Amino acid sequence: MYAVLKSFGLKGLNGFPVEVEADISGGMPALSIVGLPDSAVRESGDRVHAALKNLGFKWPDRRITINLAPADVRKTGPVYDLPLLLAVLTASGQLEDVPADAAFLGELALDGTLRPVSGVLPMALAAAENGTHALYV
């Protein structure tokens, strides 16, 4: 099962588009986040896992691979928590109808509430320049 969502990152003072891909497959249960994540992004997996369960959803008991593309640009900060959670829910069939022309940014608390993130203005400008019709922060 596969899902892809839009997000944005920050490189210096400029925003850039990031595709958050989630693939759920057979095999030993594990979570792998690839695409040059920093330590805060790698920790997103733990926050997403806890938030998903505390919101009443089921964590898929399978192998989950998350790719943050483009893979050659470093991804920093907790801004990818929300799109990771939505990608896992969509790929596992627990969420439908995520708007294809929308992008998502946000840090999650362990209970699933959203926390503020830094650098939203340059990411919002990049979203507008890239044809994103809605930005959920």
Model features per residue range: what roles?
Residues M1-V137:
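Peripheral, non-AAA+ core regions of ATP-driven protein-machinery
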